[in-house]
Amino acid sequence: MKFAIESISKNSGRLGQLRIRDGGPEFKTPLLLQTTKGGSIPWLSADVFETHVSRKPQVLQFTLSTMEQMTEALTHWNSGGGRGLSDYVGLPGHLNILLLRDPCETTPSGGNDRDILPLFTRRGKESLSSERYMEIVASFKPDMYEGLCDADTNLESAKKRVQKSVDRTEKFMQYIYEHRGKVNSTLLAPIVGGYNTFARTQSIKHAREQPAGSYGGYIFEGFHANGLSATTLDTSKLLPIVEHCVKQLEEDKPKILPGAYTPLTVLELIQQGIDVFDTSYAYCASLNFKALSFSFVQDAVEHVPFLDITDEAIKEDFTPPLSNCNCLTCQKHTRAYLHHLYKTNELLGPILLMVHNLYHYMAFFEKIRESVAKDTLPQLTELVRNQNGKTQVDYSIAANTKVISKATMGKGFAAAAV
């Protein structure tokens, strides 16, 4: 993996080029990973995504917690050589990264053991040792993979729990550093330690003590329990820790921060030097019946962050979900129709909502890269913060409570929300 910085500024973060595989496509950073569940982009087939969201190569974010059951099948799939993880899930032509936990769902706390990491899968809790993890990575053959780490910390974690997360991660990673040569994939060094600067420094020190070339980048873990909790983080606590960490890390390695961070938090993290994020925020919005409507283009109109499609007020509103959006949903359908799909639990509802939210969020990142290049990220941040209003906009996502009936499971929104 190769990472080159194109430009860097004090106010706007940095613009870079990331080449994950020799001969593969280059990706501009700040980069947006495509979050998947069970190897698929939620609600969207490969054809729908590539036709109506983006035709460009993407980096798919796979998670072991949703794909662990595929290990045996992938061992046979890859035994012939030449085929990869993206081909297996029906998304050839895209690169991928393998993470441990699903950023879209809350990860249960507890279950930690001395030499074992709990992995919460669709089949329940699995015990994951360093040896077993490397066997799985060898079966999956991802382009990049996250090092095994204890990320069971958040703002409320006690000092003892934070220290244990660092110590256990060091033990896991020591084995992985020693055996990484058996896997032809780029390792990402995990940086853990909750909100404790001393613990974060210890985690960074252990990674930087490794021989040159041991890993290709850094991934920050342990700030939240994933799911909607990432949308409500107190940035006054988060940003100083991120700044503390980034100052101690090399500039020539990409820094990844998975999770459903709000658009405003993403902009503030980019200013701190974070390079890679994911689309779990777009998924969480879709799951909770929200169409992203925040503006990132300067105008004189006051905007709101979401359109709530459960709102009865839009049942006779025949305007597009977002008037200036060029996605399939906004070009062909109306707010009233989305509301109708919600009320009837039609499968087309979450499909159209996800198409819009991904399209909008990816356009947002295009604007971010343009702003970083022009050193105008502070102006974009201010627009996103207030949306031309007088107060800061709330981008947090609350869990939906308007599920119609469990009897409708397997159809549309209800299948995911129940």
UniProtKB/Swiss-Prot annotation:
Subcellular localization: Cytoplasm
User: What cofactors does this protein use?
Assistant: Zn(2+)
What does the record say about how the cofactor binds? Answer: Binds 1 zinc ion per subunit.
Gene3D superfamilies linked to this entry: Queuine tRNA-ribosyltransferase-like
Q: Does Aminoacyl-tRNA synthetase count among this protein's keywords?
A: no
Q: Per its UniProt record, what InterPro entries does this chain match? A: QTRTD1, Queuine_tRNA-ribosyltrfase, TGT-like_sf, tRNA_ribo_trans-like
Q: Name one GO biological process term.
A: tRNA-guanine transglycosylation
Q: Which residues bind Zn(2+)?
A: 325, 327, 330, 356
A molecular function (GO) held by this record is: tRNA-guanosine(34) queuine transglycosylase activity
Sorted keywords for this record are:
Cytoplasm, Metal-binding, tRNA processing, Zinc
Q: Name one GO cellular component term.
A: tRNA-guanine transglycosylase complex
Question: Which HAMAP family does the protein's record reference?
Answer: QTRT2
State the family named in the UniProt similarity comment for this chain.
Answer: Belongs to the queuine tRNA-ribosyltransferase family. QTRT2 subfamily.
| Quaternary assembly | Heterodimer of a catalytic subunit and an accessory subunit.
Q: What does this protein do, in the record's words?
A: Non-catalytic subunit of the queuine tRNA-ribosyltransferase (TGT) that catalyzes the base-exchange of a guanine (G) residue with queuine (Q) at position 34 (anticodon wobble position) in tRNAs with GU(N) anticodons (tRNA-Asp, -Asn, -His and -Tyr), resulting in the hypermodified nucleoside queuosine (7-(((4,5-cis-dihydroxy-2-cyclopenten-1-yl)amino)methyl)-7-deazaguanosine).
Q: Which PANTHER family match?
A: QUEUINE TRNA-RIBOSYLTRANSFERASE ACCESSORY SUBUNIT 2 (PTHR46064:SF1)
Protein's name in the database: Queuine tRNA-ribosyltransferase accessory subunit 2
